[in-house]
Amino acid sequence: MENKPYQRKGVSSNTQAGKDFENKILFFLENNGITVEPQTKVEIGINAKKEHAFDFGNNSILVECKSQTWTETGNAPSAKIKNWSDAMFSFYLAPKKYKKLFFVEMSFNQKYCKTLLEYFIDHYFYLIPSIISLRFRHGGEKITNLC
């Protein structure tokens, strides 16, 4: 078996774990009467504009899904946290007409006594636009709104 130090335990691949999580969020949205399309492209930018593909969206909602967890040693996954920061910037640059939803897999850490999302909010609050809704999947299909 290959040594994959950054491979999450218990899943065939990190990419597959992300896709599985996206499918759970899509199922949740559809069950709540929200129809979205995958890979919704929207022009974003500061001076110039370029298309950016959000995980899901429609004419009024943009959705990003992140399925990262704490590292095996209990530390924050810094490279993945950068991806979350990038998602916040993309939401910030997206047209104001969209409601922005950020879904993350719940990952609790005993050392910090908080979820990875709570850690992100505590440490990177200044990067989070006030216009987004931060949510995590907690067990089954229950979604908790943190902001």
Predicted ranges, named:
Residues M1-E43:
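Acidic-basic catalytic patches of nuclease active cores, encompassing PD-(D/E)XK
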Residues C65-F120:
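Catalytic cores of nucleic-acid endonucleases
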Residues Q16, D20, E51, K82-D86:
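Short, well-structured alpha-helical interface segments that form or flank functional binding sites
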Residues H52-Q68:
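Active-site beta-strand-loop-beta-strand hairpin of nuclease catalytic cores
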Residues L101-C147:
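Domain-level recognition of nuclease-like catalytic cores that cleave nucleotide substrates
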Residues K41-D55:
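N-terminal interaction modules that seed assembly of large macromolecular complexes
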Residues L29, P95, Y124-Y126:
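A generic structural signal for well-ordered alpha-helical segments
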Residues I34, N58-I61, A94-K99:
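Short glycine/proline-enriched coil/turn segments at helix->beta-strand junctions
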